[in-house]
């Protein structure tokens, strides 16, 4: 049974676990991000089943990408980024593994070093000095100009989500007009590979 008490009677009531709280109780509530790679049959309805698993149980999808990965086009790789407690993430992986067309499920965040990248197209509308500043920042971030008019640029940029966020935030005061992002793709470093 949980004990609750006021820490200071002069302050508003804030419940907290008293002396009988265990480390496992605290770990159960810690949230973490997980990058999960799923190898599936490339057939109609598979993506809907994966999304249904998340939405039906109230799990959030932070990022989702999917594409065929073999020459024959029979396998697709789904990369899902989600956030939850360790127990929730383990439950997600177990439920994904039970779906019929799933060949393999891997939590890349736990299986060792991995690479994660996103692609973004970023439209900036500006004139004069802000336009030059946008070009300087794009050069510093290694963003490519893929379209330019007298009043706008479209930059193409690849990198970590944090790098893209930083560039986008710097473009806001300059004249950020629109952003389109792919979502995260990820792969393990070294010799390990996601195989059926």
Report the location of each language-model feature.
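Tryptophan (W) side chains
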Residues: 4-6
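Long, contiguous binding/interaction regions
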Residues: 13-39, 43-76, 81-196
């Amino acid at each position: 049974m949980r004990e609750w008490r006021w820490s200071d009677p002069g302050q508003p009531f804030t419940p907290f676990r008293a002396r009988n709280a265990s480390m496992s109780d605290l770990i159960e509530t810690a949230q973490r991000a997980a990058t999960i790679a799923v190898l599936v049959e490339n057939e109609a309805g598979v993506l809907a089943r994966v999304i249904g698993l998340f939405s039906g149980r109230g799990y959030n999808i932070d990022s989702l990408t999917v594409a065929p990965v073999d020459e024959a086009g029979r396998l697709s790789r789904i990369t899902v980024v989600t956030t939850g407690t360790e127990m929730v993430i383990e439950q997600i992986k177990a439920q994904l593994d039970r779906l019929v067309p799933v060949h393999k499920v891997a939590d890349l965040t736990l299986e060792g070093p991995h690479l994660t990248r996103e692609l973004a197209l970023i439209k900036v509308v500006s004139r004069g000095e802000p336009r030059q500043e946008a070009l300087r920042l794009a050069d510093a971030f290694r963003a490519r100009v893929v379209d330019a008019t007298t009043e706008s640029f479209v930059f193409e940029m690849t990198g970590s989500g944090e790098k893209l966020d930083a560039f986008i935030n710097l473009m806001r005061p300059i004249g950020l007009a629109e952003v389109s992002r792919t979502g995260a793709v990820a792969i393990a470093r070294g010799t390990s590979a996601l195989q059926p």
